[in-house]
Structures are given as structure tokens and as C-alpha cells.
Curated annotation (Swiss-Prot):
Fe cation 2 binds at D96, D178, H236. Transmembrane segments: none annotated. The lineage of its organism: Bacteria, Bacillati, Cyanobacteriota, Cyanophyceae, Synechococcales. This is Diflavin flavoprotein A 1. Its EC number is 1.-.-.-.
Amino acid sequence: MFTTPLPPQKRLSTQTEAIAKNITAIRSLDWDRDRFDIEFGLQNGTTYNSYLIQADKVALVDSSHEKFRQLYLDLLQGLIDPQRIDYLIVSHTEPDHSGLVKDILQLNPRITVVATKVALQFLDNFVHQPFERIQVKSGDRLDLGQGHDLEFVSAPNLHWPDTMLTYDPATEILFTCDVFGMHYCSDAVFDIDLGKIAPDYQFYYDCLMGPNARSVLAAMKRMDNLGTISTVANGHGPLLRHNVGELLHRYRHWSESQSKAEKTVVVFYVADYGYGDRLSQAIAKGITKTGVGVDMVDLSSADPQEIQELVGHASGVVLGMPPLQANADLSTNFGAVLAAMQPKQVFGLYESYGGDDEPIDPLRTKFLDLGLREAFKVIKVKDTPSESTYQLCDESGTDLGQNLIQAAKIKQLKSLDSDLEKAIGRISGGLYIITAQKGEVKGAMLASWVSQASFNPPGFTVAVAKDRAIESLMQVGDRFVLNILEEGNYQILMKHFLKRFPPGADRFAGVKTQTASNGSPILTDALAYLECEVASRMECSDHWIVYSQVTNGRVAKAEGLTAVHHRKVGNYY
């Protein structure tokens, strides 16, 4: 008898918590990662947070992902009769927060939706039915009674163009949706263990908010005019209460560092069309790894004058293909991009996979004819984006950024003190190749900055440049193999892995490998190997110091010696 195995059941649960007088958090806990979007790279699941404010008037702040439809709606109806809800505040219309808006409107057609102008436009296209609405902007208020006089703060591009924050002075709670969030699933409602959540908090920022650093600073400047913020009620992960000051400071510090970049790239996408927003985030993350600044702009809602100013001052432009049958505003903005492009700027193009993309090849030809430099091959998307697609986008962005800063790096190297660099160059280390695989994504890197750091458990550190492709595979919890090269028998492997690989290329083509128990490749010709797991990371200027614990290892040649890398100067590898 033949039976078809049932797909594994997703671990979904819900949770409620009274977080202040009259305010209840409704948390939808998604314990398993099932998306390839780049910000889910740490694979710690996520939560979708919604909030119910019950004063003289009742407001629901955001909803949940459609995968929680029955769980969420049953829980909501157990808390309150939906007919009593006066307002549905939509902070942002991405489906993971607004996936149940239509269901809530069906439960209570008289509810009034409160959102920004752009959010209401997106909702019209999503809901396809009339609904009561209030359009709000920064400084507008909504009085629910009993001191809950809500104030709204516009926060466009964090990370969608429609985002807004909501402040409740009665409880000193700031409702922020994606901002100050993290993809971290836990029963803990609040940020009790800062050390445990810190890597996820920064990774989420790097993926979604870092490419919008200027917008982050603009939003935080508006936040400065609010009252005391005692709790950040975010849309993903634990709420911030115990470490509010520290975690807000980190956002400000990271964003100030990003905004000081000497060179910038404008990354254009069309929100709510295909996978353009997700692909653009991956490209932007790759760019920011190199220290180049990014401005992310939604073509469907931007101002043409703003577009021309941004493009005019930028060193490069990345453009996602908009729909062929564009509306008038989108066509105007697309034309503004083309008109503002200048010779010698670098460019990159990618398909949005929205079903009606503008043809990409004629636009590439036009840019080349204008004298623009192509930073990476056009990214053509012929199927739902996979892990490999996002890796290609990330590495393409890194290539673009490295292209822009290459001349500045050479100039900086020449200006360094020669005696100092010669002295530092006398620090020697062994030769190793780090190999890693996570899902479909593989990576490798030649390394010499490796040092044992602990006996029990056995562990070591390795320095990884921020702009290395493998950096994204060496986050806390990731597994990899440290391949130790043999003296007198390392040249072939070293030469292979020193090559500059194009974005998305297979680093292991033509190399003999076997698979370690942790899933990463072992180089068959290595002297020895260690299977490792990343335990922690420390940021050090242009590198990450990655501390890893060893879980397994083997020596292939007992008499072999580790290859040693001797340098003469210390300003490059």
C-alpha cells in the first residue's frame, strides 16, 4: 500500500498579556521559520504582535499573519465582541501585519480604519471593499478617553513607505510595528535577557532598517518630541521594556554610522508588487556591508523631485523592474529616475517577479548607451525567490559596494604608516579555509586570522571582514567547518579560493569535498578539519570577531604540519 506522508505541522500558538492598564498584547507565535526572506536568516522563528486598547473607545493596533486566521480570530473574540471595536489602527500594510484586516472588517463592517495616506491606498487594493477610514499624519491625535489620547508619528520607509508609529501618553507605550523589532520567538513577552536577543535585534536592523538609516534618524527625531517611552510595543519578537534606552540608543548609533557614508546608492523598488521589496532588501544589505550608504525608495509613492535629488547625489542606482502597465504616478517616477541618471554612475537591475515586469534587457542597453557602468549582471527571477536567489542579491549588492569604494581603499592603504604596517605584518597565522552551508546557500573563505580562544569547551576566534559573502553564514547559531591546510600542499586550494567569484557562483566547483555531520563541506585535501558552531560575535571596526565552539574534528595526516602565512605588511591579508 502506498501512502503519502503528511507535511510536517507548523508550530503555531497564541498568547495574551496585559501590558498596561486597558492594554492587552495579542502575540501570534510562529516557532518555525518557513520563509527565505533575508531577515529570517537566524532561523529563530518570529512573533506577530497585535494590541487591544480598551478605554471609552476601543482600538485594535494591527492584526496578524493570515496563517493565524482561526487562532487569532478565536482569541480576539474571546477577549472582546468585535462589534465593540471602534478603530483598527494599521501601522503598516505588509501582509504579516494586515493579513486579517479583511476578516476583521467582516466581523465588524462599521469599524474605522486609521492609517497613513499610502497605507489606505494599499488597503484599497488589498481589501476590495469600502470601509470607514481616518487618514493621519505626524502630530495627528485620536482620543480614546481615560487619558489614551493617541499621537501618530509618520515613519516612511521603515521599512515600507506607509509605516507609522503610535504613542499612548497614558501608558508611555510606543506602538512601532516593524521598527525596533526582531525575528525571535519566545514565551517571554518582554526583553528580559538582553544578551540572548541582541544578535537577533541587530541582524533584523541590518537587514531591514540599516538600508534606511536616514529614515530611521528622521523618525527618531520625531520620537524625541513625544513624552517618556517606557515600553516599545513592536510587531515582532519580545516587547522592549527592560532595556528601552539601550536598544533605542543602538538604533540611533547604527543609523548615524550608516548615514555618514561618503558614497550612497539609491535602491528603487515597488512596494506591494511581486517580490521587489524583498529582493531590494537583500541587495541593500549587501551594499551596506561594504560601508556604502543606501537610500531605499518606493517608486509607487515617492515624490519626483525627491527622486531627482537622490539620484543626482548618488554614486549608483539599483532599479527593480516596475509593472509594465504602470499607473500615472509610477510612470512619472520611473521617468524621473531615468532623467536624473548621469554618466559614470554605477547601476544594477533586477526583476521583481510580479507577473507584469517592464522588460529588463532594453533598459540595461539604454543605461550602457548613456555611459553608465554595470555593477552586476541583471538579476532575472523566473520563479518564486529561493535562498539562492537572496544570496545572489546579497552578493550582487556587495559587489556593487566594493566597486564604489575600491579607489578609496587603495588611497587609504597608501597613506598608512609604512613602519607600523611592516611591524604588524610580522604577526603570522596558519592557513585555513572556512566552508559553510545553510539550506541551499554555500560559502567559503580563505582565512589566516584564526586563534584558539578556549579549552573547555574547545573554541577559537576568526576575524571575518564585514563585506565577505560568507559573513551572512556565520551568525550566532550557524555551523561551519574550519579546514586546516597542510604545509607544502596548500597552493592549489589557496589559489582556487582566492579567486574573485561572481555573485551566486558555486565556490566548490572542481573541488573534492565530502559532507560533515553539520551539513557543511569538508575539503578532502585538507590536513584536518573542525566542525564548529558560532557562539558569539564581537564587532571590531571593519571585521567581526567570531567565537566558535568545536563539536567534532579529525586529522587526515598525523605527520602533517599546518601551513603558515607569512606577511610583510599588515594593511592587507
